[in-house]
Amino acid sequence: MLLNQPKILVVGATGKFARWVIPELMRRDAVVHALVRNDARAAVARSLGVAEVFIGDLRNTDSLAEATRGMDGVFYIGPAFTPDEAAMGIAIVEAAERNGVKKFAFSSVIQPTNTRLKNHASKIPVEEALYSSRLEYTILQPANFMQNIGIAWPSIILHGRFGEPFPKDIKIARVDYRDVAEVAAIALTEDKLAFATLELAAGMFSRNDVVAAISAELGRPIEAFEPSFSEWVQSARLPYSEQQMHLLSKIHEHYRNYGLGGNSLSLTAALGREPRSLRDYIRELARQNDPSTPHLAKDS
């Protein structure tokens, strides 16, 4: 075990996914510090209850040195589809090692060695940097996030259908990122996951499975449909460049041809319980839409 109340730096602490790590660390008596990119994000981080906020840039080694100094552990998830993602990840690993950080939890991606997908392969150099460091690393390789369904939820409710740009019977591995966050917190506050590399999924689900769960929870039929990639992008209004969209299109092309494999064995073992199921996640979304059940946590 680390010392009581270990100091943990959460990089990008106000992001859609990194923020889930903060309450899990706090439940384990960690003192959470945040690295964010501007004053507006700093205010959000403080509202989440962190003890200290650093404003910095993953491309600025001085800010990384300042943020990692005196920390017992670091949680890191890289910015998606960024051209220099690998370099930024290596920089935070090197800063952590130079400053004597003990533990490092990296939220990578399932199947990073699928080098046909450049955004998957961009995690490999970061993993290699950890393997070649003196840090007690834990590498988390999560599947497709269930929270992506949550992002589409307003449209699902409004239009009564859910679309992704691959066939509706194709199964892909999905995971509730809150479970990934819990594993990260365990890794950063205990020793049992030190030097583990873990594929994290709750199981494999098709879009037919997703809409069946939604229909059951809402009590009305929801349709699964297959938009083209361009139609899906236009509907999703993603804040990505043309190059980032190209990388994303390759992921969905892979899903179309091969699906995405994964099982819940590693996640169940790491959590010491069954992971949150697809039905559990859908049920929470449905309750958020019910005015009689306020105050539930949202994905964003």
Walk through the language-model features, giving the residues of each:
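Oxidoreductase cofactor-interface core, primarily capturing Rossmann-like NAD(P)-dependent enzymes
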Residues: 1-45, 59-62, 69-71, 80-87, ...
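A hydrophobic C-terminal alpha-helical subdomain
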Residues: 2, 229-300
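N-terminal glycine-/serine-/threonine-rich beta1-alpha1-beta2 phosphate-ribose binding loop
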Residues: 48-49
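Periplasmic-binding protein-like
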Residues: 75-77
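Cofactor-binding loops of NAD(P)H-dependent oxidoreductases
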Residues: 55-56
